[in-house]
UniProtKB/Swiss-Prot annotation:
It comes from Geobacillus thermodenitrificans (strain NG80-2). The lineage of its organism: Bacteria, Bacillati, Bacillota, Bacilli, Bacillales. Its cofactor is Mg(2+). It catalyses: 2-[(2R,5Z)-2-carboxy-4-methylthiazol-5(2H)-ylidene]ethyl phosphate + 4-amino-2-methyl-5-(diphosphooxymethyl)pyrimidine + 2 H(+) = thiamine phosphate + CO2 + diphosphate; 2-(2-carboxy-4-methylthiazol-5-yl)ethyl phosphate + 4-amino-2-methyl-5-(diphosphooxymethyl)pyrimidine + 2 H(+) = thiamine phosphate + CO2 + diphosphate; 4-methyl-5-(2-phosphooxyethyl)-thiazole + 4-amino-2-methyl-5-(diphosphooxymethyl)pyrimidine + H(+) = thiamine phosphate + diphosphate. It is an enzyme of class 2 (transferase). NCBIfam families: thiE (TIGR00693). This is Thiamine-phosphate synthase. Belongs to the thiamine-phosphate synthase family. It holds the Pfam family TMP-TENI. Mg(2+) binds at residues 80, 99. GO terms for biological process: thiamine biosynthetic process; thiamine diphosphate biosynthetic process. GO terms for molecular function: magnesium ion binding; thiamine-phosphate diphosphorylase activity.
Amino acid sequence: MARITSEEMKERLAVYFIMGSQNSERPAEDVLKEALDGGVTLFQFREKGSAALEGEEKEALARQLQRLCRTYGVPFIVNDDVELAIAIDADGVHVGQDDEDARRVREKIGDKILGVSAHNVEEARAAIEAGADYIGVGPIYPTRSKDDANEAQGPGILRHLREQGITIPIVAIGGITADNTRAVIEAGADGVSVISAIASAPEPKAAAAALATAVREANLR
């Protein structure tokens, strides 16, 4: 499998949905199917937290959601768990600054998609050197979806990264909604990444569609 190109990666990052069983009171498969119907372009399985599944249950859910993504032709990314990603032949892995070293992850996963969380120019450059295909930058706005989230930085961090010569595809995360998507894209992000904006929405399909429309309209300006 050849490495994904930068242009392909940018397109995939448009509406990046992150979810685990702990993020919704409804069955994860139902929420994901509706989100995919609404226009999600990339999915990350993030099973973390005190209520998260483990072991065989975690793998079973991962495979279930992966099958759904394959039906829609949407890449399936695993958060942090490199061994699980390899075991189920996921399309890629995303790691944070406190997870396994990105360079080692790249060696393990070969040409699969590698995403790395970055909060500043130094971390962004390190991710690029490690072989990342994209970086996740945030939190842009305050968020309650992650217990360990850093302080919100605002869209200005995206603009700063671009001004410092960071050209790698960037997805913005943290408190993203359809209403603030335009500001994020105009500041330099290629796409938006959300958890609660879709997982907690009464209608995940409509929520995903609203984000997709917002990204598309922002890119036309």
